[in-house]
Amino acid sequence: MEASDWQGGEGDKPLEKVGSVPCLERSSSTVPTGDALVRHAKGLSQDTFKICKEYLRPLKKFLRKLNLPKDLPQKKRIKYTKQSLEALGGHINTFLQHYCRAWEIKHWKKMLWRFVSLFSELEAKQLRRLYKYTKTNQTAKFLAALCPLDAPERSLLANQEDCLPRLCSAWGLHGNISGMKERLSKMQAPGQEVVMLEEPRSSHCSRGDSLRKLPQKPKLKKKRIKERLESPKSCS
C-alpha cells in the first residue's frame, strides 16, 4: 500500500468535534457507531476513521468495556479496564510493527488511540499512559491515574501513615520511619498491613521475655548477708 493511502486522507479537512454531544454520554449498551461517531471524531478524517474502525473491529467487546456502568464495583472496573487496554494496546502495536513504516508509526499510533478514546471518558493520552503502566506492571501509578478521587484505600493508607510515628514511639522503636512509610505505601493486599504492624509487637514481646529471664541478683545478695549474720549465733 502506498504511503498516501496510509495517511488516510490526511489532506482532507478534519471533522470538527461538536461542543455538546448527547450520544457521547453513554452507558455500556449505548455506544455510538458509524457516521454518528465519526461526526465527533476530532482530528480523524473519514478515511482515517474507516481504517481504524476496520482494524479494531475484532476488538469491539474490549472497546465497549472502556465505558463501564458507574455502579459497577471498583475492583471489576479496574480489572475490565486493564484487560481492555492490554488487548487494544497489543493490537495497536501489532499494526504499527507490521503495517507501518518508521516515519508513519507516530501518526498512526496517535490516530488509533484517538479512535479508542471515542469509546471512553478518558482522552487518548490518558489511555496510552494507562496502557503503559499496565504493560510495565506499575500498578500504583495505574490506580492513581485511573481513579485519583475514587480510592477509599488511599485515605486508609494515609491514616495509617499518620499513625505510624505514634505507634513507633509507643513501642519504643526509633528506626527509619520514612523507610517504613515507603514499605507501607507499596503494599497492595490488606493482609500484608497486619503482618507489618504485628512485627514490632512480636519484637516487643521477645524483649519482655528476655527481661523476665534475667537473674535477680539483689535478692541473692540479701539472702547471703542474712545467712552470715545468723551463722555466729548458731555457733555459740
From Swiss-Prot:
InterPro entries: CHCT1-like, CHD1-like_C. It is found in: Cytoplasm; Nucleus. Its main location: cytoplasm. Residues 44-145 are annotated as: CHD1 helical C-terminal domain (CHCT). Exclusively expressed in testes. It comes from the Eukaryota. The keyword Transcription regulation does not apply. Residues 214-226 have a biased composition (Basic residues). GO terms for cellular component: cytoplasm; nucleus. Keywords: Cytoplasm, Nucleus. Disulfide bonds: none annotated. Residues 198-212, 227-236 have a biased composition (Basic and acidic residues). Residues 1-29, 197-236 are annotated as: Disordered. May play a role in regulation of apoptosis. The CHD1 helical C-terminal domain (CHCT) may bind DNA and nucleosomes. This is CHD1 helical C-terminal domain containing protein 1. The gene is Chct1.
